[in-house]
């Protein structure tokens, strides 16, 4: 695409002569800017992109998109008050509005986004729809798989990923949509066909400032749905109705504890999985899955509901296929070589930890003990730290350790957590590797060990370095050294 085409009729002030020259790329990183690129000078958390516009021009940028005019730059400048909106607009235009050529499902909620997204994608594939995935663990763009640190990529990358999906002849995409991604405009200009709400509980208050603003951010996905789209909500969530009320799309519900369009009843759990019946339009459909726990029944229901609403067809066939689905990496993932059951899970919010501990406690023998290794991330919501302790001590014995401390003092984070304990059913070991060893060493064959918080992650972030750290590998190493 040429510069004059890209900038035609955009709501911005343009300084300099806009010529018909090819645009190679859009980028936020001045270091990666090359000849023919447009540099987006955004104000970030750590630095101001406007400070690097000169470097971008030296590297070959043909235009700068910013909220400020710089009289010392010799290239075209695109100046707008709403940089977020225009960045998303240009990204979509540059990649020829790829989301309009895909059936895009957006999944939002405090917990369960990754599992619901993965299950929905697998069900779509089973029904013959080549489907991409944008999510926490990986982005699947047809034959290409990308690992990224963001649940929802920035607007430029997201449109680029959609374009690659179209190029690979995919017809659908499932996107994990975080509240932060919504608030930062990362999914602006993405045309969603469906939205799924998993649940809403305490998270990301460090970013949003209040729980009310957190909910408002999540609602943006449902406001953006078209009238011919579908809004799928968990009716057991107290906020579900408010999401349906603000959405132009057709509302569909799923639930376990109350009436809904898709309702699960007769739930039974074991270490091998879950069985339940689904009530839909007066019929009963028996469902079995290798995924364990009530929270995973919700996840399965959400995936089934949205896929069935989009594709239609034989619901019984779709339900039957659920038995072949598996949980994403790091979601209540068992490690099979230990003296007692050991699970790794991404649970890093109070609700998520409660869900996982609840099901594992149900799998314990009467004289067994649940041993929980967990910490809390640094530079994130402080208020949930003592709440995590209260949840953990309800179910078992805790080994409190470090998660991703980031720029904070790990010992202070641990102190914040421990302020929530009302008993002495915990020990402290700030070194996560040693904490895992300690938990496994104290476990008896009738116990269960849960290593929570990091799940699929293969790194640990400290103030001055990021190290390789995989909970699963550390568990296996600990088992090899102990037994």
UniProtKB/Swiss-Prot annotation:
Its cofactor is Mg(2+). GO terms for molecular function: ATP binding; magnesium ion binding; UDP-N-acetylmuramoylalanyl-D-glutamate-2,6-diaminopimelate ligase activity. GO terms for cellular component: cytoplasm. Carboxylation is probably crucial for Mg(2+) binding and, consequently, for the gamma-phosphate positioning of ATP. The modification N6-carboxylysine is found at residue 218. Pathway: Cell wall biogenesis; peptidoglycan biosynthesis. UDP-N-acetyl-alpha-D-muramoyl-L-alanyl-D-glutamate binds at residues 30, 151-152, 178, 186. Its EC number is 6.3.2.13. Meso-2,6-diaminopimelate binds at residues 380, 403-406, 453, 457. Pfam families: Mur_ligase_C, Mur_ligase_M. Keywords: ATP-binding, Cell cycle, Cell division, Cell shape, Cell wall biogenesis/degradation, Cytoplasm, Ligase, Magnesium, Nucleotide-binding, Peptidoglycan synthesis. A motif (Meso-diaminopimelate recognition motif) lies at residues 403-406. Signal peptide: none annotated. ATP binds at residues 109-115. It is found in: Cytoplasm. It catalyses: UDP-N-acetyl-alpha-D-muramoyl-L-alanyl-D-glutamate + meso-2,6-diaminopimelate + ATP = UDP-N-acetyl-alpha-D-muramoyl-L-alanyl-gamma-D-glutamyl-meso-2,6-diaminopimelate + ADP + phosphate + H(+). GO terms for biological process: cell division; cell wall organization; peptidoglycan biosynthetic process; regulation of cell shape. HAMAP family: MurE. Catalyzes the addition of meso-diaminopimelic acid to the nucleotide precursor UDP-N-acetylmuramoyl-L-alanyl-D-glutamate (UMAG) in the biosynthesis of bacterial cell-wall peptidoglycan. Belongs to the MurCDEF family. MurE subfamily. This is UDP-N-acetylmuramoyl-L-alanyl-D-glutamate--2,6-diaminopimelate ligase. It comes from Chlamydia muridarum (strain MoPn / Nigg). The gene is murE.
């Amino acid at each position: 695409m040429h510069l004059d085409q890209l900038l035609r009729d955009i709501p911005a002030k343009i300084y300099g002569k806009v010529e018909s020259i090819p645009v190679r790329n859009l980028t936020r990183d001045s270091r990666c800017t090359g000849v023919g690129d447009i540099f987006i000078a955004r104000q970030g958390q750590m630095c101001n992109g406007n400070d690097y516009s000169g470097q971008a021009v030296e590297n070959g940028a043909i235009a700068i998109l910013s909220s400020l005019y710089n009289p010392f730059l010799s290239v075209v400048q695109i100046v707008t008050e709403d940089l977020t909106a225009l960045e998303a607009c240009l990204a979509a235009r540059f990649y020829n509005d790829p989301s309009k050529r895909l059936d895009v499902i957006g999944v939002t909620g405090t917990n369960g986004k990754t599992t619901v997204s993965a299950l929905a994608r697998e069900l779509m594939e089973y029904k013959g729809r080549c489907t991409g995935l944008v999510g926490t663990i990986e982005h699947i763009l047809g034959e290409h798989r990308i690992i990224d640190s963001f649940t929802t990529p920035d607007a430029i990358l997201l449109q680029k990923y959609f374009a690659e999906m179209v190029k690979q002849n995919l017809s659908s995409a499932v996107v994990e949509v975080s509240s932060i991604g919504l608030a930062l405009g990362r999914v602006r200009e993405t045309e969603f066909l469906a939205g799924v709400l998993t649940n809403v509980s305490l998270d990301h208050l460090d970013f949003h400032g209040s729980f009310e603003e957190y909910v408002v951010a999540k609602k943006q996905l449902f406001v953006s749905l078209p009238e011919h789209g579908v809004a799928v909500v968990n009716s057991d969530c107290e906020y579900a109705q408010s999401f349906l009320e603000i959405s132009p799309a057709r509302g569909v519900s799923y639930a376990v504890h109350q009436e809904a369009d898709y309702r699960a009843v007769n739930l039974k759990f074991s270490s091998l999985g879950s069985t339940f019946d689904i009530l839909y339009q007066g019929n009963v459909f028996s469902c079995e899955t290798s995924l364990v726990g009530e929270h995973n029944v919700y996840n399965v229901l959400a995936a089934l509901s949205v896929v069935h609403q989009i594709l239609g067809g034989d619901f019984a066939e779709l339900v039957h296929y659920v038995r072949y689905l598996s949980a994403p990496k790091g979601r209540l993932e068992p490690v099979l070589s230990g003296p007692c059951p050991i699970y790794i899970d991404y649970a890093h919010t109070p609700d998520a930890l409660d869900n996982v501990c609840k099901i594992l406690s149900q799998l314990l023998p009467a004289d067994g003990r649940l041993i929980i290794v967990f910490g809390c991330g640094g530079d994130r919501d402080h208020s949930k730290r003592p709440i995590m302790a209260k949840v953990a001590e309800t179910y078992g014995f805790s080994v409190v350790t470090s998660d991703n401390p980031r720029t904070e003092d790990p010992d202070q984070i641990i102190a914040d957590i421990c302020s929530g304990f009302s008993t002495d059913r915990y020990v402290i070991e700030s070194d996560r590797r040693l904490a895992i060893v300690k938990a496994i060493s104290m476990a008896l064959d009738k116990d269960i060990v849960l290593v929570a918080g990091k799940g699929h992650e293969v790194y640990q972030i400290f103030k001055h370095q990021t190290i390789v750290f995989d909970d699963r590998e550390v568990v296996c190493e600990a088992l090899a050294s102990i037994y």
